[in-house]
Amino acid sequence: LDHVIASGEDVNIMVFDTEVYSNTGGQASKATPLGAVAQFAAAGKEIKNKDLAGIAMTYGYVYVAQVAMGADYNQCIKAFAEAESYHGPSLIIAYAPCINQGIKGGMVKAQETIKNAVAAGYWHTFRFDPRKTLAGENPFQLDSKAPTADYRAFIEGEVRYSSLKRSFPDKADKLFDRAAKIAEDKYEHLTKLAKLY
């Protein structure tokens, strides 16, 4: 992916972020968040996930968006339209619940889960459009609002987290507290980006 982005070619890339290797059975990956249980991380992943959007934005010439259809359909469509009209590499990262997350209530709750992820500050929506820099405007637009729901309550609504709480309650508390702090710091960082440019 990095090689394609670095090529500078006019290409649109869509990443469905399931936070695991979904196509091979749900193994932990660089996208798996801290505290989540997955294959090869049965006692909870102990390091935070890679910030793919942040890495792509460092190029400065890549259109980057994080979207969450269940949380903000209009932001999602706007990102698609902007990415398509951008002449250069564009990357859209969509929060995509999958069966490996163990959503309580099942996959029928996927759109509701996406909405709750944004409300809890678990996932953030934003757009980075390099064209705005050329126009003297801020290229970074934070679309999601400050979290209004409880982070821990959200993650404990998924088996990949609640199973850690059942098996290793003390460890789960420590990892979940760290994960909540990381999410809080991430939102603060994004609000600074929205003012920085």
Model-inferred region functions:
Residues 9-14, 37-41, 89-91, 116-120, ...:
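Glycine-rich loops and low-complexity Gly/Arg-rich segments
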